[in-house]
Amino acid sequence: MLLPSNLTTSTLMTSSSESYDADNPGLPPEPILSDYVEMFTLVLNFIVGAPLNLAAYTQLSERPTSTRLDLLKRSLNYSDLLVLFIYVPSRACWLLTYDWRGGDALCKIVKMFHTFAFQSSSNVIVCIAVDRLLSVLSPSHHSPNKALKRTKMMLIVAWIVALVISCPQLFIWKAYLALPEYNWSQCLQIWEIARMEKFNKPQVVPEFDAEFWYSILHISLVFWIPCIIIMLSYIIVISWVWINSRPSIRHTSSFSFHTGCDTVDTVLTRASEWNPLKTFSRHVNIKEPEKPMTTPRIVVSDETEVPLTQRPSISPSEASAVMRTGVHTSTSYNANLNRSRALRVSLLLVVAYIICWLPYNLISLIQFLDRDFFSSYLKHVHFCQQLIIFNSVVNPWLYGFFGPRRPSTTGAGRH
């Protein structure tokens, strides 16, 4: 069974011409083994993913105050729910019936929401990456309210852009009665309909291949442009972390006593709490004005450490000595720990997105470069498509909605 020429994540119904039986041209096509396998995986993804995402939705919506990461997780949860409750049922119903019975209006609306669901997923992941980048570059990181407003604005723009990109589907997809004698109709792109109507007529190659350029533009907007933005953002963040994790006199207190190097959590914490990046300098100028009372950072090397508030009480003189050696209060400890967790959760979500989306979109590019090579890998395409659905299933596990709650009154809007 061939895939449509517009092999993008918005192409979610196989056209009638793709499953058309050449030996019996007058009969509707019948499902094959790969269709039943795909239907099984869709149902399995729904059974596992729907409860997880609904539980995540319930817990996220019950939180009285929202950090930046909570806002990003909410938007990602909304897009995952769209994928699981709009795309999965409609695709499964089509595989079950091999017929489109919703009429022209529903065909257009469903296709628009398909594109909207996948485009919003990509856009939210971009927001997560850009938020991590701005936490290093932007001065608003030191103002929690400004940072929270910035994240809200990014998400609003992301959803509006997803809606705008989805609207052309209203004009590209149509319900088409392919076999009137069997009342067998399909929801097809206008180019597929034109090819079917001209099946027995001489083919005229158009000067401007609208379908080709539409496919290139669409796959770029859905995946490749977001992927490039994500990669650039994390390259800058990782470069910033690496440069500023080099051993120096100023940060000797952040070394591990076992290895003599910065711990992983210390490096991650620095990426979210240091001053905004202006130039990639190595702090050559050591002669800085000494401040009368500076509070060094705490090394967050183990998330299971006992908070400082639970440690034995000490005398005032000992407390003064502890302050001089760089130990913060439990509030500072929790804030640094939450920043470190936020960075790791963000990185996990981005990595899962790349792993799940890249195979399908690579194959979609191959069809434009080498159709013969592309044809040899068609049997793997639906498996790669299921990886994209699986991404919506695994996201709640990655951002850990079932984990321990963080303090809602400390560091709000800073993560």
Swiss-Prot record:
The record's Pfam families line, in alphabetical order, gives: 7tm_1
**Keyword terms, alphabetized:** Cell membrane, Disulfide bond, G-protein coupled receptor, Membrane, Receptor, Transducer, Transmembrane, Transmembrane helix
Is Kinase a UniProt keyword of this protein? Answer: no
From what superkingdom does this record's organism come?
Eukaryota
Tissues where this protein is expressed: Expressed in the ASI and ASK chemosensory neurons and in the IL-2 interneurons, but weakly expressed in other head neurons in hermaphrodites.
Molecular function GO labels: G protein-coupled peptide receptor activity; protein heterodimerization activity
Q: Where is the signal peptide?
A: none
List cystine links.
C107-C187
Q: Which InterPro entries does the record associate with it?
A: GPCR_Rhodpsn, GPCR_Rhodpsn_7TM
- Extracellular topological segments: 1-35, 97-108, 174-222, 367-382
Q: Where is the composition biased (Low complexity)?
A: 1-19
**GO process terms (BP):** G protein-coupled receptor signaling pathway; G protein-coupled receptor signaling pathway involved in dauer larval development; neuropeptide signaling pathway; regulation of cAMP-mediated signaling; regulation of dauer entry
Q: Where is this region: Disordered?
A: 1-25
Cytoplasmic side, ranges: 57-75, 130-152, 244-345, 404-415
Q: How does it sit in the membrane?
A: Multi-pass membrane protein
Subunit structure comment from the entry: Heterodimer; with daf-37.
- Name of this protein: G-protein coupled receptor daf-38
- Give the organism the record lists: Caenorhabditis elegans
